[in-house]
Amino acid sequence: MRRFIFMSLGLLVLAFSLSGIGANQNCPSGWFPHNISCYKLFTERKNWDQAQRTCMEEQENGQLASITDADTAVKLSNKLSGNWNFFDIWFGLSLSKTRGFWLWPDGSMVTFTNWGKGEPNNFWDMESCAALTAASGYLSWNDKNCGLLHYFICQTQSRGG
């Protein structure tokens, strides 16, 4: 009986320890998890509209990433700065020409920002898309011309979220 209890406890401990392996099992292959979302960096250079379209085609409910809090900003910065440090990266923030303020791809209002110093400046009235800046380690944001070609980061909901 003692041996049975000991073996049962051992198997239980093993099961719990293995449950943490493959923690991104709720994300598609090649995507990394954070909170209830999955993210993927695309290293093809596209303009903002092409990047958004690629995100939508890549995954159901896919879109350019929304950075809605400091925790997500830091997580993405840490993940991205470990891989790339010379190209800015499109994410999902864009200036609504009709409404005159910044919106996420799903149309929701911005409640958290991390603009770089002096940004957004809408330089020459031609900057209505946002990018994570390489110079800041992908932590701060810069408004840019939507037609420029950059890497981009997509987001989708995790299967468990």
UniProtKB/Swiss-Prot annotation:
Domain of life: Eukaryota
Cell compartments where the protein resides: Secreted
Mannose-binding (motif): residue ranges: 117-119
Protein's UniProt keywords contain Signal: yes
Binding residues for Ca(2+): E127, N142, D143
One Gene Ontology molecular-function label: carbohydrate binding
Principal subcellular localization: secreted
Key words of the record: Calcium, Disulfide bond, Glycoprotein, Lectin, Metal-binding, Secreted, Signal
GO (cellular component) term, any one: extracellular region
Glycosylation site residues: N35
Pfam families linked to this entry: Lectin_C (PF00059)
UniProt key word Metal-binding: yes
Annotated C-type lectin domain residues: 34-155
CDD domains tied to this protein: CLECT
Signal peptide (from-to): 1-23
Coiled coil: none
Tissue specificity of this protein: Expressed by the venom gland.
Disulfide bonds: C27-C38, C55-C154, C129-C146
Record function comment: Mannose-binding lectin which recognizes specific carbohydrate structures and agglutinates a variety of animal cells by binding to cell-surface glycoproteins and glycolipids. May be a calcium-dependent lectin.
Record-stated family: Belongs to the true venom lectin family.
PANTHER family: MANNOSE, PHOSPHOLIPASE, LECTIN RECEPTOR RELATED
Name the UniProt record assigns to this protein: C-type lectin lectoxin-Lio3
